[in-house]
């Protein structure tokens, strides 16, 4: 199967991944929309970095429904879920593990970023995301 180029990061070719149609619980549509209007600071800060294909021409979805879950960000062309872990995630380790196993069962890759790092180290967060994408998809 021929690889298709998605973009270049640091001069390195990044290839698309073919992800099958994902399950979607339509009962979560209104919740997903309301979360997009929410103002979790770290999510807003990250979104400003990636919206409108501003991050290497890669298209990000925000508050994407996958199965019975709503993920923070999703890159369809790579099959990557990006989760921002803040204080609300500290007491939900079992839930997060179950959710991650489900996402990985769909052949998705989960990338986690701490809320604290986005607020305090954004440049390195974006550099680390570049490095992750290069490592996994070049």
Predicted segments, located by residue:
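Solvent-exposed, charged helical/coil patches
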Residues: 1-57, 136-138
